[in-house]
A protein has these predicted regions:
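Hydrophobic anchor at the beta1->P-loop junction of P-loop NTPases
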Residues: 5
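P-loop (Walker A) phosphate-binding loop of NTP-binding proteins
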Residues: 8
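Loop/turn-to-beta-strand initiation segments
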Residues: 71-74, 96
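Walker A (P-loop) ATP-phosphate-binding motif of ABC ATPase nucleotide-binding domains
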Residues: 2
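Small-molecule kinase domains that catalyze NTP-dependent phosphoryl transfer to phosphate-bearing small molecules
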Residues: 113-154
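Conserved lysine of the Walker
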Residues: 13
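Conserved substrate/cofactor phosphate-moiety recognition/catalytic segment
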Residues: 18, 22-60
């Protein structure tokens, strides 16, 4: 199973994903690392990605998900904002979504505090506009400590209990 930690930029996908992967003893991957250079340049310039920009990235992730499932469980941090994106990534099964949900104000503050990341805070509005909250995900509020979020996820997915 690949557990996909999803949500808008700044919600804590990477941090929660890394802690969850360590807790489960599985590999962690960050979908940001699979963006083509053209997408990175576009985001760094403050231009939102469109569905055509995202399609090759999502197809690449879908292939990696098949590979990761063959190797065992894994955790992937990925925005997965739209249902159509989730459909591409999960079309061959073996995925479970964990949605990190937070208010725009909380997320904006996190982005303002962040350094060394290529996602400008002013793209947040476009992410919230694109966001189609999932109906088939574990929903975790981001306004609680990281360890509490991970404990909630572990309880919901039923693996990794000490």
């Amino acid at each position: 199973m690949v557990y996909i930690i999803m949500g808008v930029s700044g919600c804590g996908k990477t941090t929660v994903g890394e802690v969850l992967a360590e807790r489960l003893g599985v590999a962690f991957y960050d979908a940001d690392g699979y963006h083509p250079d053209a997408n990175r340049r576009k985001m760094a310039a403050g231009t939102p990605l469109n569905d055509m920009d995202r399609r090759p990235w999502l197809e690449n992730l879908a292939e990696h998900i098949v590979q990761w499932n063959a190797e065992g469980d894994a955790v992937l941090a990925c925005s997965a904002l739209k249902q159509s994106y989730r459909n591409i990534m999960g079309r061959r099964g073996g995925v479970r979504y964990i949605y990190l949900q937070g208010s725009r104000d909380v997320i904006a503050q996190r982005l303002d505090d962040r350094t060394g990341h290529f996602f400008p805070a002013d793209l947040l509005d476009s992410q919230f506009a694109d966001l189609e909250p999932p109906t088939n995900a574990v929903v975790v509020a981001v306004d609680q400590p990281i360890n509490a979020q991970v404990e909630q996820i572990v309880g919901a997915i039923g693996v990794g209990h000490a």
